């Protein structure tokens, strides 16, 4: 197997296959669940709006892939600084049956100099999650500066985040290798690689992209660090490219490119 094919297979099993569009329907989510199951393995998870969790759970169970995890989003996509609303949404997501919650960090508050609200929001959302994985989206493409990206990453980790995630996919600039490196370095430098994972989201579209991101993680955190507990790709159009690279002809219904 070529290096690119090996990376493609690795990436497929780390995907949070995503549809987070305003026109999402039960039918689109059912189709997404079908796409999560491929001839070469399943994606790690799907990522959907909370209201679709029950239909997704049913579909995944019926197609024999109940192990595909269901991630959902809260405080999404704007990352407001209302802790009460973020926590209420997170509690509701847990009640719906989410396996994982991707919450948006109040990044604009941090840009305005407020470090406390982000810490408190993440801390309370993690308390609401209990054992459920909490991924925190810091919106790197809006923070832009290394100092802010590293500070947001540190705050999230100190507040109990299980993962730090680059982006919502809803702003002009999403995951980039430059931002990914900054966040991976924080995980390394804080000594939390055992407990904290990383998720680039938006803009990872090809097997070559995925291979480069994985090589970077191997370089910074070691060859054995990347697994589904420590690394995810938030993507939709990536799956088709990975399957093409692997020469698997599964028909994939492509949600709007993410």
UniProtKB/Swiss-Prot annotation:
Pfam families the UniProt entry points to: DeoC
Superkingdom of this protein's organism:
Bacteria
Q: Where is the active site?
A: 102 (proton donor/acceptor), 165 (schiff-base intermediate with acetaldehyde), 199 (proton donor/acceptor)
Which reactions appear under catalytic activity for this entry? Answer: 2-deoxy-D-ribose 5-phosphate = D-glyceraldehyde 3-phosphate + acetaldehyde
Keywords per UniProt: Cytoplasm, Lyase, Schiff base
Q: Which SMART domains does the record associate with it?
A: DeoC
The record's GO CC annotations read: cytoplasm
According to its UniProt entry, one GO biological process term is: 2-deoxyribose 1-phosphate catabolic process
User: Which Enzyme Commission numbers does its entry carry?
Assistant: 4.1.2.4
SS bond list: none
Gene3D superfamilies named in the record: Aldolase class I (3.20.20.70)
Which pathway does the UniProt entry assign to this protein? Answer: Carbohydrate degradation; 2-deoxy-D-ribose 1-phosphate degradation; D-glyceraldehyde 3-phosphate and acetaldehyde from 2-deoxy-alpha-D-ribose 1-phosphate: step 2/2
Q: Where in the cell is it found?
A: Cytoplasm
A molecular function (GO) held by this record is: deoxyribose-phosphate aldolase activity
TM stretches of this protein: none
Q: What does this protein do?
A: Catalyzes a reversible aldol reaction between acetaldehyde and D-glyceraldehyde 3-phosphate to generate 2-deoxy-D-ribose 5-phosphate.
Family from the record: Belongs to the DeoC/FbaB aldolase family. DeoC type 2 subfamily.
Protein name, as recorded? Deoxyribose-phosphate aldolase
| Originating gene | deoC
């Amino acid at each position: 197997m070529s290096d690119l094919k090996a990376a493609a297979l690795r990436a497929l099993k780390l995907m949070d296959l995503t549809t987070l569009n305003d026109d999402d329907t039960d039918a689109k989510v059912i189709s997404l669940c079908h796409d999560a199951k491929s001839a070469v393995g399943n994606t790690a998870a799907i990522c959907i709006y909370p209201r679709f969790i029950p239909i997704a759970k049913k579909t995944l169970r019926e197609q024999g892939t109940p192990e595909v995890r269901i991630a959902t989003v809260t405080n999404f996509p704007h990352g407001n600084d209302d802790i009460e609303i973020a926590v209420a949404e997170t509690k509701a997501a847990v009640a719906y049956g989410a396996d994982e919650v991707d919450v948006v960090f109040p990044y604009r508050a941090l840009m305005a100099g407020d470090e406390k609200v982000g810490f408190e929001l993440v801390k309370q959302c993690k308390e609401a999650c209990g054992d459920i994985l909490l991924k925190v989206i810091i919106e790197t493409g809006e923070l832009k500066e290394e100092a802010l990206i590293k500070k947001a990453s540190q705050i999230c980790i100190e507040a109990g985040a299980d993962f730090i995630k680059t982006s919502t996919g809803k702003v002009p600039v999403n995951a980039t290798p430059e931002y990914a490196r900054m966040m991976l370095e924080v995980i390394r430098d804080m000594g939390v690689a055992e407990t904290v994972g990383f998720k680039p989201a938006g803009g990872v579209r090809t097997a070559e992209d995925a291979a480069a991101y994985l090589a970077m993680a191997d370089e910074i955190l070691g060859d054995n660090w990347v697994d589904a507990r420590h690394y995810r790709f938030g993507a939709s159009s990536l799956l088709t490219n990975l399957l093409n690279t692997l020469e698997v002809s599964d028909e994939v219904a492509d949600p709007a490119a993410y």
